[in-house]
């Protein structure tokens, strides 16, 4: 597993990357304990972006990353 850390203003965004294990992974958007979480897969790797950044701005970043 790898992690990349981004910063947008005062918000930290963690993107976790791990090898895809099996089966299709559909894009998901969740909110837990004040954090927005987006996950997606490119078929080879699974990605999880986690931040207290608002949903729209986190979505912009994940789209730039290929979600």
What are these regions (language model features)?
Residues 1-67:
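Polar, acidic low-complexity tracts enriched in Ser/Thr/Gln/Glu with frequent Gly/Pro and Thr-Pro motifs
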């Amino acid at each position: 597993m790898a992690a990349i850390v981004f910063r947008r203003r005062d918000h930290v965004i963690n993107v976790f990357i791990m090898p895809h294990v099996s089966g299709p992974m559909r894009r998901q958007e969740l909110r837990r304990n004040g954090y927005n979480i987006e996950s997606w897969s490119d078929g080879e790797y699974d990605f999880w972006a986690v931040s207290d950044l608002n949903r729209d701005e986190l979505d912009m970043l994940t789209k730039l990353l290929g979600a």
